[in-house]
Every structure is written in C-alpha cells, then in structure tokens.
C-alpha cells in the first residue's frame, strides 16, 4: 500500500509532533507535493522541504514536507512527486527532477484543497487544492503501492476526516490505486492530510498515486484502470476504516473544501474519492493529465484545462474557486443534503441555494470576459479541457464542458474540468486502453466520456483495472461529474450519453443516473432553479460551444473514435502526450527518465502533470494548442501529446508549441501566454501537424544523417519506451512514443511524441496550415495582439504555457547536447530523449531559463500556429510528440516538400529524433535547455517555453515553417521584440542584447524601423520579416513562431532560431512579447506570410520574423502584438517584393539604413512603435539587391526559409529567412523581398538575429535545408538568429550557414537577447546558433569581437545549441570564442555543410552568396556595410568586419564571398 504523505499545509508544515500528518498538508499542500509524479518525490523531493508558511491556503511555497515526514511515509517517499507536494508553484522543490506544480497552478489549485489549514474544515479555499492534491496524487505509486501505506493513526485519521472537509485533499487522495487519504488536524489547525494511498494491487495498473485530491487522476495515470478510490470505495485499499472513513470524510471535506464539487464528491465520492479527485482535477487535472499516458489525455485535457487552466483553466480555476467556493458550511450542507438524499448532487443543492445559484448563474453573465476567455479557450482552449483528452477529445469534452460549462457556473468549469480531469484521469486510466476499455464500464465510459470525450480514449490500457477502478472511481467521479452536470442542468443523458458510447452505459450507472434528481422530486423552487440553470447552461453551451451543443456527443463520439489513437497520442502523446506537454514536462520527467516513463504513462505523466503547475501553463499552452486541432489534440495537453500531431502545432506545443513547450510555467508565469499560446496552438495545430511533420522532416533533414538511424532509433526507442511504459503499468499507446521521448536521447524524446502524434498526423496534415500557412494562421491566427486574430496571442500566459510545452523542444536538443546541458536543463533528468527535448528547452540561453517559459509562451503564443506549436510543442515535447508521421505530415503539408526534399530522410524527419533532436540539435535551443529544468523552467517559465520553442525549433520550426508554411506558425510570437529595446530586454538576454545593443540601440531602432520596414518589407517577410526578425529579433524570437507561421518552413526556422535563443530568452522575459511573434506569423507561409497579417508585423512575416514589428513590440508583449498589428497593416504595404521603398538604405544613412530611419526612429526605441511605425522599409533595397544575388539563388526559398526556399517556396522560407532580415527577405516571394531581406538582413540582420539566435538557426535550417544560398544569405541575417538552428539543422545548414552568418550579425542582438545574453553575444548568439554564428559570425564578424560573447553563449546556451550539434563548430565557437568562432564558423559551416552536406556547400556557397549581392552590388555592399556598422555601432564596424571577415573567411570559407555579412565583405565584394 502506498501511502502518500502530502506535504503539510503550510501551517501544518511546521513540523508537528504528529508528523504522521506530515502528510497532513496532503490535501492542501499535497497538491504541490503530489505534484511530482509518484517517484519518491515525497522522500526525495518532498523531503526537500518546501518552506511553507503557515498559510491558510497552501501556497506552493507554503507547503513544506518535512523530509522526515516525507520519508516517514513510505508511500510519500515512494511518491516522488507527492513530495514536491506543497511546492506546486512555489515548490520548485522537487528535488529530483520532481515536477512540481507551478505555483500559479498550485496556488490556484491549492486553494481548494488546502482550504485554509487553519480553518480547513470551515473554509475551502477552492477546489483548486483538490486539484493540487490531485496533482500530488499523481505521484506514481508503482513501488509505493507495494509499500504498506502508512496508516494514519486512527485518531489522526479521525481528525483528518474531521478536518478533511476543510480540505479537498482528503477526498480524491486515492489514485490509481485505492488509497485512503487521512488528514489529521494539527493543533495548528493545519490540516495534515495524510493520504494513504494504497495501491490496489491491480493486475494492470501500476499503482499510481493520484495527486491527493485526485482520486482518479492517479488512476488515470499509468493505470487507467486503477482509479483511486477512497478507502471506503477502494477495493483493495487496506487503508480500510481509518483511511476509509477518513477518506470519506476527507472526501466530504474535500467536497466541502472544494465546495460543491466536493460536496458532490462527497455525495458521490464518499465512495469515490475520484470525484474529489476530479475536483482536484479541476486544478489537478493538469496534474491529472500528467497522470498517465491515458492521463496524457487527461493531461492534455487537464493540461489543457489547466493550460487554459493557466490562462483559462487556471484562471478559471481561480474563478472557479470563487464560483465554487462556498462557505464550508454551505459545502457541508450541500454534502449533507446529498448524503441525506435531499439532493442527488451537491450542485443540485447549490443550485437550490439562492446565493449560490445567483452566483453561479450570474458568474459568467457578470464576467463576460471570463466567458469570452472560456470561449476563447474553448475554441482553442475549452477543448483544452477536453483537450486534455486529446485534441479530439476536446470536442466531446467541449460538449461536455459545454454542457458542463454552463453548469460550470455552478460547478463551473472547475467541475467540468474536474470532470474532465476526472474523466481524463479515468480516461487516462482507461486511456491507455484507447478503446475505452471501460466502455463496458459505464462509469469508466461515462467518466471518460463525460468529462472528456476522452472517455473512449480511455482505454484499455488501464483496461481492466481501469475499468474496475474507473468504475468505482470513475463511476463515482464520473457520476459525480455527471451529477454536477446534471445538477447544472446539463442533460448528460443527451450529451454525455449520446455522445459517448460509454455514456450509453451511463444509464446503467446508478450514480450517473442519479446525477439528476427527477424534477418531480424537486421542490418547485429547485425545479425552477434547475430550469433556470439548464437554460443558462444551454445558453452557455450555445454561447461557448455553439457547435458542440448537441453535436458534441456526436462529434465527440466520432472524434473519440478517431481520437483514441490520436487521443492517445495526443492525449498522452501517449503518456507522452502528457509528457509532451510534459515534453516539456518531460522536463520534469526529466526529473527522471523513469519519471518520464512513468510520467509518460503514469507517474511520469503525473509528474509531468505535476510540473504542469509550471508546465501546466506550458502544458496548458500546449494544450491550448492541442485544443486547436482536434487532431491536434496533439495539442492537447498533450501538447506534447497532442502535439503529437500538433506537437508541432502544439507544440506547439508547443509547444511548444511550442506547445511549448512546453511548459506550464509559461502558463504559470505567463498565463496569458498560455492562453494565447493555446489558442495559437490550436491554430498552429492545424498547421502544427504539417509543421510537426515538417519539423520532423526538417529535423530529419537536419539530422538527415540521423534520418534513417533516427528513424530506427526512434522506432526502437519508441517501442522500448512503449514497452517499458506498458511494463511500468503505464501503458499508453502513445506512451511508447512518449517514453521514447524520454528515452530518445536526442530528438527521440521529442520524437516519441511524434509517435504519439502519429495518429494525429493524419488529420493534421489536412488540418495543417499549409493553406492557412501564412495567410490564415498568420492573418487570422497570428497572435497579433492588436488583432483579435491572435488567438495564439490570446493570452501570453497561454502562450507561455504552450511555450512551456514547446519548451520541451529543447529536448530536441539532442541528447548529447541536452545531456550536457541537461543537468542545467534539469531536463536532463528527463532523460536523454526527454531531456533531449528538454534540452531544446535549454535553448540558447540558460540564463533565460526563467524566461523560457515566456519564450515558450511566446512561442506558443506564436503558436503561429504551426510553428509555434510545432515548435513549441515540438520543440518541447510537442515536437517530440509529433509522431514522425506527424512530422512528416506536418512538415509535409507545407514544408513537406521542402522538408522532405530538404530533409534527407523523411523518416529521419519523422523520427522523433530528427525533429526533436534535430531541433535540439539546432540547439540553439539547447542552450535553453539549461534553463529547461523542466519544472524549474516550467516553473520559471523560461526554459520550458523556450525549450518548447527550441526543441525542435529549428528543425521543427523549420519543418513547421515549411509545413505550416509559416502561416500557422506565424503565430509565433515575436517573443522578443525586446531586442528592439535593448534595455527593454525583458530579461538579461535582452539586456545582453542591450549590451550588444549599443548597437542594439541602433539595432533596436533599426529593428523597429526594420520591423516597420519589415512589415513593409514584410512582403514576404522579405526583408520585413527578416527585419522584424532582426530588429525584433528578440521579438523575432517569438516571432520565430510567428515566423514559423509565415515562414513556415523558413519562418519556422527562423522562429525556431528566434525561438531558440532569443526567443527563448526573450520569451522568458519577453514571453509576452514573444507573443508578438504572432507577428511572426507574419511571415506567413510566404512572403505574404510575412504579411502574416497576424503577425505583429502584420504581414509580415518579416515582421514575424523580424519580430520586427514584434521586435518593436517585442519589448512588451503587447508591443509585440501591436507591431504585428501595425506590421500587419504595413505588412501588406510592404508586401511588394519591393517594399524597399522606405527601407532604402542610403549611404548617407547607413546606420539607419534608411529602413531604419524610415520606420526606425519612431520605432526606434519603441518596440511597439517600431513595429507600429510602418515606416516604409528603409532602403532595404540595397539589402535586397545585396541579398538578391544570393537571393536570386535563394530567392525562392529565402535562405532562411530554406524550408520554403528549399522547397522552392522561397516566399515562405523567405520569411523564415526573415528571421534574419535577410532570411525573411529571402522568404519574401520575390527576390526583391529576399533581397530586401538580404539587405535588410544585413541591416536588420543584427537586429533580427538579435533575437534570432535560433531564428537564425531556423534560417539556417531553412537555408541549409534548401541549401539555398539565398537562404543562407538571408539566413545570414536569419542565421544570426537562426544560425544556431541552422547549425542545428546542418542538413539545411548550407543555406543556414549564411543565416548563420547573419545570425552572427544578428547574434549580437540575438545573443544579447537570446543566446548568451551577452550583448557582444552576437557571436554568442551566433554561437548559440553555432553553425550559424560563425557563418553568420563572419557576416556578423563585425561582432566577432563579440566572439567572446559567443563564448559566453557557449557556456550558457550556445553550448547547448552546439550540443545540438547543430554545428559542432558552433559549439566550438561557443567554447572557443573568437578563435573558435571562426573555427566554429568553420565547423559551423562544416556542420552545416556536413549536415547539409552538399546543401551546406551549396548553401554555403549560396549562403556566401547570401551576402551575394555584395559582389554584385558594391554600392549596396558599402551601404550595407555602413548600415551594419551603424547598426552595430557599438563595435567598430571594422572590428566586427574583421572578425566577420576572419570568420567568414575561415569559417565561411565555404560561403565567404557572399556569406560574410560583413559589410566590409560586402564592400569588398
């Protein structure tokens, strides 16, 4: 029997004589504690005492688990995650990579469960606590279950039960295994709830502890089959009386603590803590989501819920707390009334209560914004809730939710979420058995169904156990949920029953049937109330889920049908799904491979789920993502999971994004991001699939060498993980993939996601945004803050969440790289595979780790749909999650050709490794990885998001770009416009950037101008995008996503690049800005993508890439958007291939490069303005022309765009190239654009690249991919940003090389912002980009002096990147610094070249050409040179040039002529 000791409530926490209660805080604190998956979090992690203050509500930090206490309970120690327990948000405390819920989440969650310790019995903070507990419950119980649960002393139990009310913790303590939760009341009034989880020795399910509050979640985890039951209910529980009664009380308490939910639970849950769990699920769901592969779904759902939870769910949860937080007395009364038979459900009871009724009824009406939010998330996010299930599930969930949601008023989302979560748990539990093993089990079925359509996806995995437990718990929980819904007036019979096959059994389920008290049994008042409620609910459903209203059932059913695999995939990404989110989560998984495995399937997921606190956001973001696409449910929390398909999309998730991402932190940190990300994700998702495919492809491309092997490895890993997971009792279809994620050292992890994604893969492609690639996603979806479209943008938080997801991307990093960084990444724990993903998270800048989330967010936000998601999600887990197929399909769609073409091995691409690893390889993200620390990052928000971004960023993004073609990815937020404002630097990187940016000032101005220009340029991003990228580089980073969107191939790449470093970095601080990246969106798939209306750039992809607008905006997230908006506005204007108009660079104003002047001055320091000020593109023309020659070569696929370019979709890719201005330009359809970009790149390059490290990479990727010189050329600017990615994508590298060069130029900015954070870091950035840097470095060589910076980068983020192996040279560069730089460049080139092989060479040459026009147009070259000098005023142009030259010559030798961005070079030329 596993006894999970939850951390005490803060007050409780104070060691108390009755340490038994060390778990005391189980309920309140628990959530946090449980948050970690059940690995020995308690003892290991838990022991890490979280400092907790006596707090009525358990704040994550408040919760503290005394090591002794933790260890006291064998279960606790067993459940690693639980240990983190109290530290959900604040907890960070997971010691061994334990995931902790993000504080946001936790806090939210905490409320409910925690119910203030002091008045735990009386005061329920909110249902959140339960959720938290649920998270806690997630704790894996494998071994734990074996251990005897520490039985709470009878007295304690009694006390606990008494106190339990106050806390929901007591309630759903049970997880997969029946566990009884004993809460004991401490003298301090601190509830100590000792959750004795006893693992029911079930044949299939591995004992998984749900977070305390989640009865089901635990089940959901590995063993779908092992629903947690309160001892009373538990079949095997030895908790027995104590536990049982205690549990029951707790349940009751929980119910009360959590309010109706709890009461409902009590009602139902007395028998089923599950409901309690569900309640917890609301918040916990995320955790719940984490709970098992099935949970993956759940995770997805939960994550989604949470994700949105972070933005939506979480916020909503908080709202729910308010909504559902009734006085304890009221809750008790409700529970009593239910128990006494007066009411069938607590909700029913509450519905009859005027105050409650009014509150619930009026809640949404009074909070239209909330409804909108709900709606927003619904469309994108609501499904989150469902999404948890899977993208698909969401529909049903949505329907359910719809049904529930209205009723949510009463129970509110919370309930639905809980239900979903519960169901998800169940689903998760069952999910493993996709078939809805529990179908026969009405309860299980119902639960799944009800909460999520996911029910069907429930599955067999848990199969029998799941069924049993699910029956008990599920039934209970589900019935409770149903009851709640029914009480809410939702006609579950109709919806639930109708929609889910399982639901049909619902009729057979007494509890379910009993949910609705017959009207005849109601008093007239009650009846009236019910009618009113039903009407309101109906209204709500119509309002929120118009499409799901009645068709939900059908939709869900149909989707469920397809969802299962998908769902599984998406959902858990298999376990991965969750993981995916986790991917980023993986990060937490990261905590331990095992965790991941567990996590993926069960505990790992749980753990992930836990992370969700952090990750939740990310996850949420990702989830949002998933949401978007049904299939993309990949997005589904899965986010990773879903990301599978959407992985990229979810990813997008991202992410990561991405859907993230991935991770929650974004959510947590930047909830808004999350939301927006989620939205974006959704969009992305559509794209994502393509993206993911693309990404994968690109990845493959990038890792073409790995292609075949990767594929094989991927398969092996996948199988291996899958098997392990199954063995682990965490069976999940996706699990395998998920696990692979973990396992896969490089991209495998990410890829594992892919596997999961695979199912999604099918739909995504169709969905993929190829069509919408630039225009739709970008235009529509672009998260341009200014534009409503920015679904992606919706909420930075969301984005963040998504990003978080994406964060995992970094995992992609590549095991090696990751590994190295992993430690820093924290992901390391995740495992190579996961870690890899996480590594990506590492991204360029670890320092930014904190920011990553934001970046992720950005990325997510950037969602850019595809890119971001893919990136996000892919980058994080999402990418990984994408199944190779997914990738293919994803990449394929749009970039598929490119990708495929570019990517040597489709399979390779597909192989998770490729995309994931590749991206990681691209590592520019790797650096992020360090930040990755899954949970930390998630928590910190920085890494995850970043990672997600990063993760496959380059590759993924690139792929995505190709695939999403940008459009969708476009969304990506130019996370960092910050570079724009050097000082804006949301974070150090920006500062660094700033540092760099003396020049940066210029750059910033330029960026803004460029942004403006870019917008203008925006023509395809042509220059604009690039410019954006460049200027906004930082933004761009976000934009990466955006880029992705527009770029699609290129854009994505760029985005990645951006994302990777800058973005991440930016993202971290700029996360919101990153959103801007929507502007990224700009970029659209093609040049127009640049226009990417959405993108802040507006069209601009350049913008997008450029971040440009974003850039300007970048500094403030909003800014980002605005730029997008402005960008968008101007974007069109810029569109013309010739948008050089304003951009003209005059020799007289080289500094401004006129394009800067044109737009710059306004935008100058104004990130927002910059974006805003349209300012016609300065004379980018010269850049254009300058770039044109190369452009010509790369014309089609902006070097950056390579994906596109390589595809021949120069425009799109151009966008990508956009990342660097050049790349973007390249992207522009016309050469002109490209040229502009090229020109721009030169000019804006620095800027673009500023943020772009990754972007560069992307560009590189693209450039490299296609091998476009142009690409490279453009890439150069792009490279600056994308360099790393390019480097990462050596295959593509060739083109990338130039981008690299560009990157280097850009690097400075980029680095500052992103990579190294060294202003000087151009190189750093480049370095980050690694291959790119030097390549770019040459170009950027002027910055070369910054080589040192590069060095810095290497240390921090670049290293990772290089780790990606993007270009080992890059790494070298990082490591070596100047000398290295060149060498790096060389290596970079080599890598690029080698990776790209011929591409490299070709690209390299072309890349060199990138500078191309330089020889052709000396005048231009000179102008450009001046411009650059001015741009990088800080460094002596000469110096920079020299360095650049040197590097170019030495590294760029391949691409020396054009490649060297060096103005001098140009001039010389």
Curated annotation (Swiss-Prot):
InterPro entries: BCL9_beta-catenin-bd_dom, Wnt_Signal_Transd_Protein. GO terms for biological process: canonical Wnt signaling pathway; chitin-based larval cuticle pattern formation; imaginal disc-derived wing margin morphogenesis; leg disc pattern formation; positive regulation of transcription by RNA polymerase II; regulation of transcription by RNA polymerase II; segment polarity determination; sternite morphogenesis. It comes from the Eukaryota. Keywords: Developmental protein, Nucleus, Phosphoprotein, Segmentation polarity protein, Wnt signaling pathway. Changing residue 537 to K: In allele lgs-17P. Its main location: nucleus. The modification Phosphothreonine is found at residues 11, 208. Changing residue 514 to E: In allele lgs-21L. Residues 511-555 are annotated as: ARM-binding. It is found in: Nucleus. Belongs to the BCL9 family. Involved in signal transduction through the Wnt pathway. Binds to ARM and PYGO. This is Protein BCL9 homolog. It comes from Drosophila melanogaster (Fruit fly).
